Amino acid sequence: MSDTTELVDLAVIFPDLEIELKYACADNITGKAIYQQARCLLHKDAITALAKSISIAQLSGLQLVIYDAYRPQQAQAMLWQACPDPQYVVDVTVGSNHSRGTAIDLTLRDEHGNILDMGAGFDEMHERSHAYHPSVPPAAQRNRLLLNAIMTGGGCFVGISSEWWHFELPQAASYPLLADQFSCFISPGTQHVS
């Protein structure tokens, strides 16, 4: 594993960016807070890409809302314990792109302050969360397309098919896994990953 000198704090770089870290509260697949600290970190190589996406969103009168970025390996182990399905959660032995600092989870807020309906919530691990699932109503499909265009419009991020909210750098998996940057709450049965 590599050190974490490649990570930057999004709250410092983008002070107006809305950050709602879902794993720092109970609003996630585990039903409990995982992160002991609400730190939103991302690999320095993704900062230019995110800046482009923020600008594209603003042109549309929208705002990005960040749900997750860098994720400690210990947190990944807890997510795997809650949902051991490789279609939705990467086994900690493989290593998540979040644990490389190269992936980000997010949604959109409109000019009236409303989160756009995406047809399925964050961390809903079922087919309706897939990027273009036919059961998602047309209005929510359009919102997903809008999010996808904002994130991929600068040619800097790519999405994945199983989660409408997840975007990552191209070749994200080629980056090294990073040492845990902050602590997580330990749940029974979760082993610390070094």
Task: Give the residues covered by each predicted segment.
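Extracytoplasmic cell-surface/polysaccharide-interacting catalytic and binding patches
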Residues: 1-69, 81-194
